[in-house]
């Protein structure tokens, strides 16, 4: 069941990227979409989320270094590092951010209202004040 959720996250990311990636076949690095990944801490479940995200993107045709450039940052279980990383992703003008774990998602949401943010490993997004409601 958890694997399905992880793969679903990757597929959602691929769909989000497909709206941002043009039809150009040119492989200039300036055409690459920047994806930031902020992970709170190294942990098997969180690592699996990141792996599922990358696998889902690759399955949808988005390989790191080709159409996209993934910048992975681990906050080493320091919330202040999450904030610093989030600020850096805003400065870098990432096109999409994957936030893994609640503090990472909260830091990213506090820093940007313009960058699409995918969250995973968040038990209750509404309780974490990431969304107004968990209902559609």
Model-derived features: positions:
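Short hydrophobic alpha-helices and adjacent helix-cap/hinge residues
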Residues: 2-14, 18-19, 23-136
């Amino acid at each position: 069941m958890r694997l399905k959720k992880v793969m679903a996250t990757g597929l959602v990311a691929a769909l989000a990227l497909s709206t941002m990636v043009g039809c150009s076949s040119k492989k200039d690095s300036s055409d690459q979409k920047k994806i930031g990944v902020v992970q709170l801490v190294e942990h098997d479940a969180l690592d699996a989320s990141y792996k599922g995200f990358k696998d889902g993107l690759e399955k949808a045709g988005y390989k790191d270094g080709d159409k996209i450039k993934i910048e992975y940052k681990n906050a080493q279980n320091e919330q202040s590092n999450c904030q610093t990383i989030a600020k850096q992703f805003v400065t870098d003008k990432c096109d999409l951010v994957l936030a893994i774990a609640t503090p990472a998602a909260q830091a990213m949401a506090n820093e940007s209202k313009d960058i699409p943010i995918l969250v995973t490993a968040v038990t209750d997004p509404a309780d974490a004040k990431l969304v107004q409601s968990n209902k559609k």
